[in-house]
Amino acid sequence: FTGLPVKMQNDYLEIVQPYLDKNLVHGIRCSTRPDYISLQRVKEIKHLGMRNIELGAQSTNDKVLKHCKRGHTYDDIVEASQIILSEGITLGLQMMIGLPYDSEEKDFQTAKDIVNLGAKETRIYPCIVVKDTELEALYRNGDYKALSINEAVSRSSKLYSYFIENQVKVLRIGLHQSDELDKEGYVAGPYHKNFAEMVFSHIWKEKFENLKNSESENLKKDIII
């Protein structure tokens, strides 16, 4: 959002002002890049009702960010996060699993960094190979291996549980369904319209298996669904 021309940003925000004034809307949320954040601009959009800013961090590993050509670094994520928090705005940090040069260990480190940076919200997206992209070329040449559905579900379930334990709200798991991916655009990767439900099912399956394998026969557990 903050990468748009300032006039366009303001025009969008001005449309909402009457609704804010009447308490019909309590705040505005936007998503943007870490390298498109400045203290001055955050102050300005806060004045116009911005209450939540999500940053598309994707990873906090500089090697992963470089090879994915994200155009920002871990330091950019840290600086942008600090600016947002300094203005009392709720911080969200989005992450993506299965990126080139990524690993489950690096994914979990990204999750730890998201918690430590003070984010209160996150989104977990799996990396998908889309037609006519550089990632497709890497995939076709055997230089990139996409995550399977099962692997992505397993990783996402661990990340979700970690975020919940650390009071970080997970706003979404999995990509939005789109006509492009449903038709010719999809090449490879863990894309499924019910991806989030698969993750939650995996989490509950593990919880029940842990109960089943408990050493104490008289162990009583309350499970709230």
What is the predicted function of each stretch?
Residues 1-121, 131-150:
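Conserved non-cysteine loop/helix-boundary elements of the Radical SAM core domain that shape
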Residues 125-130, 176:
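Short glycine-enriched loops at secondary-structure junctions
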Residues 133-134, 140-225:
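Auxiliary Fe-S-binding modules of radical SAM enzymes
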